């Protein structure tokens, strides 16, 4: 009896849930959700979707039901934006792909089967979160369909990178990476990274277009290019992947030596320049993303306040080094145009700051696009926008008329007036249209006030009768015109159609052709080996087979010829070995296995050119052994260094270099600060600053793991006696000569003695028993 009652209860529960699901499915009307009629056009549907999406987005609307409402809006737009799904919904009340009588018969079976699956496999009963809709509601608001990806994500990827996850139902690995994905999404979305999720089961066309043939897959999109993430799914790896998508030249490292050149580039680049002062040696990811979003409008630089030589900048611009400070410079490099300072800068604050300072105070019109932005078309009588245009000749330095025009613009900043200037020799048609009497203004500057009436180029304008010299009378006349214009817009009596501006900053034809060719080759490469590799496999197999047939015989013949030559020349090689054997130094049998085939040690100089390849990007497991020397000790130390390390050159993981102490003392002292047992680095204002002698120091640098081992030479008896004999020398004389002569009266023999124990140190290095000093990052080698 009890079993029968339990069975009836379960049946009643099943029927009740089934009825509720059917009613909820019938209540969903995409037209009502978007608030449009059944005859609405795609433009109306898209407009309504954008309006509702902005209103109900969970990040902006704190209503508890905002997320559910946003999901309904997205589903409604997905149905109505697809003509096939919309037609199916209008005819059968559902957005599926099947039609007609078969579709109507399958609807009841689908509802019951859907309920059956949810009942037996829902996580609320058995905790198996295989259904993606039940598994993670956070993915719902990031779901992409093909039209949304093509029309919105790809164009938007030219302003910000996108991180997209490909998932599916019954994906165990997808469940495994969910916690990491949630954490990364929450972090990167706040920084401005676009997020997307593609369900491979429902959006097969989009998944195939992206080249994702397995789940889970994570990829990045920037500038329309797709890059796959091929590393362990952890937070740090995903963050580095997004950072690697960005171009490397977005932010320039600014120091006390180059900040004047950086800020003075506004005239050539026609852009404001932004500087961020911060205490971290690495550029923040938020700042890089901002630089990518506004790369067409501003130039970005970064100042690490912990670097030597930045004190002058911090004093000059009154920077608080204990909090991040953002400055924007326009035409004047001595004083920033705007400043913000905050310990925790948010993306919205930075975006508002950058948007308010996107253009120079009196920007130069270099393209038609910039003309549209600075001088927009009038939308109504209340939204009039006037442009005051200075027509002047191009000069290498700022001319007096332009400086006067700039000072006038600074003193008369208004929302309805924008000040710009044009180089008459570069935009001759544009300037000729605004100057009715070109001969009267030949070689002189002129000022015109204009208002755009439509996008076709129609403008009304007024040109000042006399040339612009920048005098006080000229400023007074221009100010009178602007005051009169507020009361009587009919002052602009002349009318004309302006020609389109020539793009002055566009690359020349050959460069454009080269860039287009590179992009085309890159797209072809991606389409062959990335997106459509499965379809291209037969063709690739055919090509490689043909190449093997054509060149196989040639390669075999070449190897046979070389083997014949080797068989015919053993006596010559024996004679050569006897000759070289006389010149090579003798070594013990114990070290004979380490002796390379070369009869010399290859030692390269560590400079700013070889710094990246020989250290920063050194392969894992490889080390660079660097000798510190000066110009006066170079010959003697290199000879002794080569003799000491010769027996260790048989290892392919060791590289040998030398560093000039005269050129890169600051770099060396920065590294030695991380050595726990190293002597303290003196202050640069100390009178004994330049007396410290680092010649003979040897550093074993591991570029991949960012650590180094230190060899410090021990003073020999001869060296101590030589130094003692110099103690009576006048200290001022010693200071004057110490820069070029680090040791007084030391011959080459005591200098070579500094490296007498280097071979023992090298053996300990290979054993791994030396102390390691880790550093956060490799400093730049200036």
Curated annotation (Swiss-Prot):
Alphabetized SMART domains for the sequence: DnaJ
Glycosylation sites per record: 631
Cytoplasmic side of membrane: 26-535
Ranges where the J domain occurs: 29-93
Example GO biological process: regulation of autophagosome size
Extracellular side: 557-782
Disordered, as annotated region: 562-593
Membrane topology, from the record: Single-pass type IV membrane protein
Compartment(s) where it occurs, according to its Swiss-Prot or TrEMBL record: Endoplasmic reticulum membrane
Entry keywords, A to Z: Autophagy, Endoplasmic reticulum, Glycoprotein, Membrane, Signal, Transmembrane, Transmembrane helix
Protein name: DnaJ homolog subfamily C member 16
Biased composition (Basic and acidic residues): 563-582
Known role: Plays an important role in regulating the size of autophagosomes during the formation process.
InterPro entries, per the entry: DnaJ_C16_autophagy_reg (IPR052448), DnaJ_domain (IPR001623), DnaJ_domain_CS (IPR018253), DNAJC16_TRX (IPR043361), J_dom_sf (IPR036869), Thioredoxin-like_sf (IPR036249), Thioredoxin_domain (IPR013766)
Domain Thioredoxin: 119-247
Top-level taxon of origin: Eukaryota
PROSITE patterns: DNAJ_1, DNAJ_2, THIOREDOXIN_2
Signal in keyword set: yes
The UniProt record lists the keyword Membrane: yes
Leader sequence residues: 1-25
Annotated transmembrane regions: 536-556
Gene Ontology annotations for the cellular component aspect, listed alphabetically: endoplasmic reticulum membrane
Polar residues composition bias: residue spans: 583-593
């Amino acid at each position: 009896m009890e079993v029968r009652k339990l069975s009836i209860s379960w049946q009643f529960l099943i029927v009740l849930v089934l009825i509720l699901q059917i009613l909820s499915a019938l209540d969903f009307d995409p037209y009502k959700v978007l608030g449009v009629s059944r005859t609405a056009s795609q433009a109306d549907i898209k407009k309504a979707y954008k309006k509702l999406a902005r209103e109900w987005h969970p990040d902006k609307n704190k209503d508890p039901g905002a997320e559910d409402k946003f999901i309904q809006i997205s589903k409604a737009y997905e149905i109505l934006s697809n003509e096939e799904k919309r037609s199916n919904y209008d005819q059968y009340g559902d957005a599926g792909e099947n039609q007609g009588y078969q579709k109507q018969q399958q609807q009841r079976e689908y509802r019951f089967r859907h309920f059956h699956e949810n009942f037996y496999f829902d996580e609320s009963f058995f905790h198996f979160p295989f259904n993606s809709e039940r598994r993670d509601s956070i993915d719902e608001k990031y779901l992409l369909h093909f039209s949304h990806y093509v029309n919105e994500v790809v164009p938007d990827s030219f302003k910000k990178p996108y991180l997209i996850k490909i998932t599916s139902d019954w994906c165990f690995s997808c469940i495994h990476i969910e916690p990491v994905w949630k954490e990364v999404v929450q972090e990167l979305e706040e920084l401005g990274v676009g997020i997307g999720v593609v369900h491979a089961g429902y959006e097969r066309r989009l998944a195939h277009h992206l080249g994702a043939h397995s789940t889970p897959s994570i990829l990045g999109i920037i500038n329309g290019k797709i890059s796959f993430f091929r590393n362990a799914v952890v937070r740090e790896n995903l963050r580095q992947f997004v950072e690697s998508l960005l171009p490397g030249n977005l932010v320039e490292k600014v120091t006390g030596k180059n900040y004047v050149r950086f800020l003075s580039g506004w005239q050539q680049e026609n852009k404001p320049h932004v500087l961020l002062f911060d205490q971290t040696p690495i550029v923040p990811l938020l700042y890089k993303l901002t630089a990518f979003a506004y790369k067409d409008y501003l130039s970005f630089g970064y100042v690490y306040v912990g670097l030597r030589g930045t004190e002058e900048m911090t004093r000059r611009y009154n920077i608080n080094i204990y909090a991040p400070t953002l400055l924007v410079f326009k035409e004047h490099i001595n004083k920033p145009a705007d400043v913000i300072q905050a310990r925790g800068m948010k993306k919205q604050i930075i975006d508002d700051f950058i948007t308010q300072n996107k253009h120079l105070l009196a920007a130069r019109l270099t393209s038609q696009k910039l003309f549209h932005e600075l001088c927009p078309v009038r939308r109504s009588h209340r939204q009039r926008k006037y442009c005051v245009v200075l027509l002047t000749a191009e000069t290498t330095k700022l001319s007096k008329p332009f400086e006067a025009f700039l000072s006038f613009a600074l003193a008369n900043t208004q929302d309805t007036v924008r000040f710009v200037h044009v180089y008459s020799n570069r935009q001759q048609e544009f300037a000729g249209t605004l100057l009715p009497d070109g001969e009267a203004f030949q070689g002189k500057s002129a000022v015109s006030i204009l208002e755009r009436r439509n996008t076709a180029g129609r403008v009304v304008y007024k040109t000042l009768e006399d040339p612009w010299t920048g005098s006080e009378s000229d400023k007074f006349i221009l100010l009178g015109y602007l005051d009169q214009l507020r009361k009587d817009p009919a002052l602009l009596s002349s009318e004309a159609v302006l020609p389109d501006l020539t793009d002055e900053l566009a690359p020349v034809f050959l460069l454009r052709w080269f860039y287009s060719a590179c992009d085309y080759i890159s797209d072809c490469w991606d389409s062959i080996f990335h997106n459509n590799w499965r379809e291209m496999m037969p063709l690739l197999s055919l090509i490689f087979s043909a190449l093997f047939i054509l060149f196989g015989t040639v390669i075999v013949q070449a190897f046979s010829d070389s083997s014949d030559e080797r068989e015919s020349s053993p006596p010559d090689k024996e004679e050569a070995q006897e000759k070289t054997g006389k010149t090579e130094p003798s070594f013990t049998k114990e070290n004979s296995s380490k002796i390379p085939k070369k009869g010399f040690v290859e030692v390269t100089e560590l400079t700013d050119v070889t710094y990246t390849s020989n250290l920063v990007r050194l392969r894992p497991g490889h080390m660079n052994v660097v000798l510190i020397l000066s110009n006066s000790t170079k010959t003697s130390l290199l000879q002794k260094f080569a003799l000491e390390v010769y027996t260790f050159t048989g290892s392919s993981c060791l590289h040998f270099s030398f560093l000039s102490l005269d050129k890169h003392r600051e770099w060396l002292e920065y590294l030695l600060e991380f050595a726990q047992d190293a002597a303290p680095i003196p202050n640069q204002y100390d009178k004994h600053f330049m007396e410290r002698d680092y010649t003979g120091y040897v550093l074993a640098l591991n570029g991949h793991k960012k650590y180094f081992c230190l060899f410090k030479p021990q003073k020999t008896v001869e060296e101590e006696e030589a130094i003692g004999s110099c103690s009576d020398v006048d200290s001022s004389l010693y200071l004057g000569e110490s820069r070029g002569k680090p040791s007084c009266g030391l011959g080459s023999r005591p200098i070579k003695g500094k490296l007498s124990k280097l071979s023992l140190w090298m053996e300990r290095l290979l054993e791994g028993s030396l102390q390691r000093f880790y550093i956060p990052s490799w400093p730049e080698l200036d």
